[in-house]
């Protein structure tokens, strides 16, 4: 393909992305854009970033051959990129460290974040403790109930957790509240956005920080199997773990990229969180233009997923663009399929995956039998499932 060079100076990925925010936030975003442009060209910043990833996060995360599961499926070989092994248990820490270092450079003493599953909240609270910053995390009240272990973790790490009671009480509402806080406290506060969405420059800088995932696997897979995988696959909510896996492969011919959205109770039911694969129209949410789940009047519709981290009505603008140009494809996996993959991964590989990651695992398990035994699917195992055991137990009628 032609050289891939996105976003443009205005933060557009084709027709998606951009900056659709209140005037009060423009100054903060311009400031962030200028600082990030400086940082991007500064090798000392990246040296510090990679030093932290190695010595604090424990990178590089390994690639792992899921042999027993692959054998049982009888087709393609399934490999995992083990982001679950990072400090704090998910890919979120890569982005949180990058943004916290940026905040420190900008002299900000207070950081805020939104969180769904709680993983980004934990990652933000972690880096705030690491760098001595005040931390406030906004979390939908519904998610606070679903993810009580992560709420307690954030508090242990010194963060203030604010339950958001408005709207559907999930991730989008937490994001709204975080943006309100930022508008009010823009001079002292840095907003550590948790996914590759939101207004420019967030989709770009988040992507740059999480691209370490695909950059590593691009080196690791040839060492492990002598070549690149046939398919790379990742779950997509806002889309940060997926863009971190995909971006380094965009210009690599022959590597298929598949993003797996949350099919909830099935796309036909309307109770899902799959804006791209369900053919949702384009709209603006949280400062950015993307495919967006909305009704005929343009009102955001309530989403559903068994996984709190995928329960979001929009998606990062770069994914919309990759879909439109045909470089990546997007599919959905429903709650039941994801839960089945969750249990299979536990039983066959001794790894408890996050429910988010289980969507990507389920798609891999679904297609592997129809592929050749010499073909390879690399799944971004974006996080571990300790945080989800209450949810999974509850669905099985078990009280912990």
UniProtKB/Swiss-Prot annotation:
EC number(s) per entry: 4.2.1.20
Gene3D superfamilies in the cross-refs: 3.40.50.1100
Pathway in which the depicted protein is active: Amino-acid biosynthesis; L-tryptophan biosynthesis; L-tryptophan from chorismate: step 5/5
Keyword Lipid metabolism in annotation: no
Molecular functions (GO terms): tryptophan synthase activity
GO CC aspect terms: cytoplasm
Keyword annotations from UniProtKB, A to Z: Amino-acid biosynthesis, Aromatic amino acid biosynthesis, Lyase, Pyridoxal phosphate, Tryptophan biosynthesis
Tagged with keyword Kinase: no
Modification sites for N6-(pyridoxal phosphate)lysine: 92
Enzyme class: lyase
Cofactor(s) in the UniProt record: pyridoxal 5'-phosphate
Substrates-to-products reaction catalysed: (1S,2R)-1-C-(indol-3-yl)glycerol 3-phosphate + L-serine = D-glyceraldehyde 3-phosphate + L-tryptophan + H2O
Oligomer status and interactors: Tetramer of two alpha and two beta chains.
Entry function: The beta subunit is responsible for the synthesis of L-tryptophan from indole and L-serine.
Stored NCBIfam families: trpB (TIGR00263)
Family (UniProt): Belongs to the TrpB family.
Listed name of the protein: Tryptophan synthase beta chain
Lineage: Bacteria, Pseudomonadati, Pseudomonadota, Betaproteobacteria, Neisseriales
């Amino acid at each position: 393909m032609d050289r891939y060079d996105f976003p443009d100076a205005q933060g557009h990925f084709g027709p998606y992305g951009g900056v659709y925010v209140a005037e009060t936030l423009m100054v903060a975003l311009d400031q962030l854009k200028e600082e990030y442009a400086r940082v991007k060209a500064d090798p000392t910043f990246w040296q510090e970033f990679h030093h932290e990833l190695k010595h604090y996060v424990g990178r590089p995360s390994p690639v792992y051959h899921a042999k027993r599961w692959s054998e049982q499926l009888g087709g393609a070989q399934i490999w995992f990129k083990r982001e679950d092994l990072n400090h704090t248990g998910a890919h979120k820490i890569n982005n949180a460290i990058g943004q916290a270092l940026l905040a420190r450079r900008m002299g900000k003493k207070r950081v805020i974040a939104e969180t769904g599953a709680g993983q980004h909240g934990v990652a933000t609270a972690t880096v705030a403790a690491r760098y001595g910053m005040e931390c406030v995390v906004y979390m939908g009240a519904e998610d606070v109930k679903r993810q009580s272990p992560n709420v307690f973790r954030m508090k242990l790490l010194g963060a203030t957790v604010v339950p958001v009671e408005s709207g559907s009480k999930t991730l989008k509402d937490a994001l709204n509240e975080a943006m309100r806080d930022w508008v009010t406290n823009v001079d002292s506060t840095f907003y550590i956005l948790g996914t590759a969405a939101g207004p420019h420059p967030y989709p770009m800088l988040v992507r740059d920080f999480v691209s370490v995932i695909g950059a590593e696997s691009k080196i690791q897979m040839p060492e492990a199997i002598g070549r690149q995988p046939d398919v790379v696959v990742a779950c997509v909510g806002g889309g940060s773990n997926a863009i971190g896996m995909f971006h380094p492969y965009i210009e690599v011919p022959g590597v298929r990229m598949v993003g797996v959205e949350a099919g909830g109770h099935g796309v036909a039911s309307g109770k899902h969180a799959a804006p791209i694969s369900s053919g949702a129209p384009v709209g603006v949410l949280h400062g950015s233009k993307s495919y967006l789940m909305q009704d005929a009047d343009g009102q955001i519709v309530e989403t559903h997923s068994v996984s709190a981290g995928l329960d979001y009505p929009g998606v990062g603008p770069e994914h919309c663009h990759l879909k439109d140009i045909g470089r990546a494809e997007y599919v959905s996996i429903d709650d039941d399929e994801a839960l089945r993959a969750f249990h299979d991964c536990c039983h066959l590989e001794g790894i408890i995956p996050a429910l988010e990651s289980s969507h990507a695992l389920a798609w891999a398990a679904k297609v592997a039998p129809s592929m050749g035994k010499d073909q390879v699917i690399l799944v971004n195992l974006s996080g571990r499932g300790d945080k989800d055991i209450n949810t999974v137990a509850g669905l099985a009628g078990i009280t912990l």
